[in-house]
Amino acid sequence: MVKLSNLLVATFGVLLVLNGCLARQSLGVPPQLQNECNLDNLDVLQATETIKSEAGQIEYWDHNHPQLRCVGVSVARYVIEQGGLYLPTFFTSPKISYVVQGTGISGRVVPGCAETFMDSQPMQGQQQGQPWQGRQGQQGQPWEGQGQQGQQGRQGQPWEGQGQQGQQGRQGQQGQPWEGQGQQGQQGFRDMHQKVEHVRRGDVFANTPGSAHWIYNSGEQPLVIIALLDIANYQNQLDRNPRVFHLAGNNQQGGFGGSQQQQEQKNLWSGFDAQVIAQALKIDVQLAQQLQNQQDSRGNIVRVKGPFQVVRPPLRQPYESEEWRHPRSPQGNGLEETICSMRSHENIDDPARADVYKPSLGRVTSVNSYTLPILEYVRLSATRGVLQGNAMVLPKYNMNANEILYCTGGQGRIQVVNDNGQNVLDQQVQKGQLVVIPQGFAYVVQSHGNKFEWISFKTNENAMISTLAGRTSLLRALPLEVISNGFQISPEEARKIKFNTLETTLTRAAGRQQQQLIEEIVEA
């Protein structure tokens, strides 16, 4: 009787486990995502879709491709013509971008942060002594939406987070202008907005989920940006489909690739009733309807008519100070950078900032959460590589990240080996092509021709690699006895394998004649 009871309990437990597994399989994991990383063959990927706008175009890679689906990312290339403006958008996934070509001005809107860039020039037609409409608080009235607390700040109390300096600047209510303003500034600001930054070739910049971002091409050539969305990131609470939300403009050709491409995509205002918009923004209904861009067919990249006037600092110096890049104190006090003032970009195309540099071979530069703290929030990082002719990157693998390699110039050969020891990729890669290198897959990169340049995005804020050859390699760390017994070779041969390569990252790729000479020397 006891045995029968135990048998029934065991049977019930097995059925419960099986039921839970089946429920998870049917509800939690869609069929198209099951076994999505069974990659027996890798391909060099090309952009599959192009969406054109008035002043540029966006090219997408199919995020449903097995390789991109495996690593959980979506990739796009933005081409913004001179004078083009990429309208404000935000995503549900973290985004990291690299400027391949050109210069521009970018801005990101972080919810809850103040407008720290202000233009104190008087507006056209503004009369002397007449405040800007909506800024009647200079006489003691609060701004619209402030209430008593904001009104008290006008009586000499500092704003939250200002301190004595800000308080002194606010004592201008008795006739003194705000700190940094003259008589014109006392009349009101022409414009106020959040931080604006210059971007140029070689810049890596990141965007957190939900933070709107815009960019303007201020240069004389097309601004080309390659961007990656980490749709498998924990901050994306939806499915593994890239979702872009537009604050302005309409895209009649579709969304961010994949399943959204067949459906026209409008901005967020289009879904609201015009009367509701008018009440929320305190404007008339006709202007509210204009926000919905119902008849706008320019797309998401529009051409700016006339000069593009935003408050921005002068173009930064070519080299930032080392003190800024490497602060004296290894532990911050929490005041240096907040989410509002945090830098969102870092240039990694400057040879002076290379982590590995050999003039005859090339250079490698990485950016992670230590050099760009915002990457800690998005959990992404990047590596810039340049190989000279007949050079190679020693075989290695990514320990804790997937890698998405994009060729920015030249040609190169890439070989990738999977967990079964099979060569799953051995192809030439050229400008504009993409290669997915899953975590743990070993690979080697060789230049083909004069030069090979690339940018790699990695799905970890502090991605780590392990080399298979060289002075700091896995083989170098093994005892000779392990190598000789593992490969059934003599101790002398094991010594050659372990110590012959002195480089750590880059080396010279031997040509056929050089390789034949080495073999003759070894045989002799």
Curated annotation (Swiss-Prot):
Key word Phosphoprotein present: yes
GO annotation (BP), single: seed maturation
Annotated segments matching region Disordered: 119-190
Modified positions (Phosphotyrosine) in chain numbering: Y78
Highest taxon of the lineage: Eukaryota
Bias-annotated ranges (Low complexity): 124-188
UniProt modification remark: Proteolytically processed during seed maturation at a conserved Asn-Gly peptide bond by an asparaginyl endopeptidase to produce two mature polypeptides referred to as alpha and beta subunits that are joined together by a disulfide bond. Phosphorylated in seeds on some Tyr residues in response to abscisic acid (ABA).
Residue ranges of every copy of the Cupin type-1 domain listed in the record: 42-289, 346-495
Localization of this protein: Protein storage vacuole
GO molecular function, one term: nutrient reservoir activity
Chain positions with Phosphoserine modification: S53, S97, S259, S366, S484
Expression across tissues: Accumulates in seeds 8 days after anthesis.
Phosphothreonine: modified positions: T116, T459, T501
Keywords: Disulfide bond, Phosphoprotein, Seed storage protein, Signal, Storage protein, Vacuole
Disulfide-linked positions: C37-C70, C113-C340
Signal peptide start-end: 1-23
Induction data: By abscisic acid (ABA) in an ABI3- and FUS3-dependent manner.
Recorded family membership: Belongs to the 11S seed storage protein (globulins) family.
SUBUNIT field: Hexamer; each subunit is composed of an acidic and a basic chain derived from a single precursor and linked by a disulfide bond.
Function: Seed storage protein.
Name of the protein in question: 12S seed storage protein CRC
UniProt source species: Arabidopsis thaliana (Mouse-ear cress)
Lineage: Eukaryota, Viridiplantae, Streptophyta, Embryophyta, Tracheophyta
